[in-house]
From Swiss-Prot:
Any GO MF annotation of the entry: metal ion binding
Residues given in the record as S-adenosyl-L-methionine binding sites: 158-159, 189, 212-214, 293
Effect of residue 112 to A: Loss of activity
Disulfide bonds: 105-338
Organism: Mammaliicoccus sciuri
Additional remark text: Reaction proceeds by a ping-pong mechanism involving intermediate methylation of a conserved cysteine residue.
Name of this protein: Ribosomal RNA large subunit methyltransferase Cfr
Chain ranges passing through the membrane: none
This enzyme's EC code(s): 2.1.1.224
Family the UniProt entry places it in: Belongs to the radical SAM superfamily. RlmN family. Cfr subfamily.
Binding site for [4Fe-4S] cluster: 112, 116, 119
Cofactor note: Binds 1 [4Fe-4S] cluster. The cluster is coordinated with 3 cysteines and an exchangeable S-adenosyl-L-methionine.
């Protein structure tokens, strides 16, 4: 058993070895954290008292590297504000489905520098990339409280594929000695960072991938999402086709419905044309239509989603044989929905 030395688990392992502790000590510690849900070194009674004191002196009282600042609750949703290093803050969302499933939407960056016009997170710029421990601790926090970890999505603050630490986090989440999750329980959303998509294909082929499209027209997409100038739609779609070819895995397409901007039937038909021209006529693409969530912190304001227009858009895609769903929304009242994270906290600083 050897852990990545970028992680707290690897650092603890190195510390134990440097102090000539027996190899089984690291297993005792990871069992205490992940099987017994013990967060404080002092409470790991399986360890000798002197070792517990040494761990506290070197790593702090608790195994968590992030600090709880605030919590908000809504029906089926809990949003938590954490403090990370450099006194920065990130948000994490826990969603409980009525069937008993628990999903976690986690952040990969504090802020974001890609400047999508409809997103509150991007309006503050990039403050820092989260470390691997700051990423995984968002889930560990809930695990230690007794929550069931069924699925994790990198759809919180930041562009996940712009932070290399995300790949280390994937390793920790799937490590059988740590979180022990199947890669199919993990989802990454990206605005289209081509080099990192290639890495996912090659090294993490079973992880679910979502591409944020939001407009089928390249010029319009560049206005909404400046990243399109660097990685244009067609180039990203070619890479996604290759991902599907090599992995035989479905790719999800996220499409935020911006009233009067990208929700016309013309847009719907163009999405159909875009996907039908892809590998296997787009049969392994699945479109998630997302109602726009108003937030005063986004660079531009759009109105409430027009339900009739959302339904009409859906029917165009459905009738053309495109796999499509309208995503259920949770946590809008506490700014925990798509595109809302960190907005109100930023305004209050």
């Amino acid at each position: 058993m050897n852990f990545n030395n970028k992680t707290k688990y690897g650092k603890i392992q190195e510390f134990l070895r440097s102090n000539n502790e027996p190899d089984y000590r690291i297993k005792q510690i990871t069992n205490a954290i992940f099987k017994q849900r013990i967060s404080r070194f002092e409470d790991m009674k399986v360890l000798p008292k002197l070792l517990r004191e040494d761990l506290i002196n070197n790593f702090g009282e608790t195994v968590l590297n992030i600090k709880l600042l605030a919590e908000q609750n809504s029906e089926q949703v809990t949003k938590v504000l954490f403090e990370v290093s450099k006194n920065e803050r990130v948000e994490t969302v826990n969603m409980k489905y009525k069937a008993g499933w628990e999903s976690f939407c986690i952040s990969s960056q504090c802020g974001c520098n890609f400047g999508c016009k409809f997103c509150a997170t991007g309006d503050i710029g990039l403050k820092k990339n989260l470390t691997v421990d700051e990423i995984t601790d968002q889930v560990l926090y809930f695990h230690l409280l007794g929550h069931q970890i069924d699925s994790i999505s990198f759809m919180g603050m930041g562009e996940a594929l712009a932070n290399r630490q995300v790949f280390d986090a994937l390793d920790s989440f799937t490590d059988p000695n740590l979180f022990a999750l199947s890669p199919r329980r993990l989802s990454i959303s990206t605005i289209g960072i081509i080099p990192s998509i290639k890495k996912i294909t090659q090294e993490y082929p079973q992880v679910n991938l979502t591409f944020s499209l939001h407009s089928p027209y390249s010029e319009e997409r560049s206005k909404l999402m400046p990243i399109n100038d660097r990685y244009p739609i067609d180039e990203v779609m070619n890479i996604l086709d290759e991902h599907i070819r090599l992995t035989s895995r479905k790719v999800y397409i996220a499409y935020i419905m911006l009233p009067g901007v990208n929700d016309s039937l013309e847009h719907a038909n163009e999405v159909v044309s875009l996907l039908k021209s892809r590998y296997k006529s787009g049969k392994l693409y699945h479109v998630n239509l997302i109602r726009y969530n108003p937030t005063i912190s986004a660079p531009e304001m759009y109105g409430e989603a027009n339900e009739g227009q959302v339904e009409a858009f859906y029917k165009v895609l459905k009738s053309a044989g495109i796999h499509v769903t309208i995503r259920s929304q949770f946590g809008i009242d506490i700014d925990a929905a798509c595109g809302q994270l960190y907005g109100n906290y930023q305004n209050s600083q």
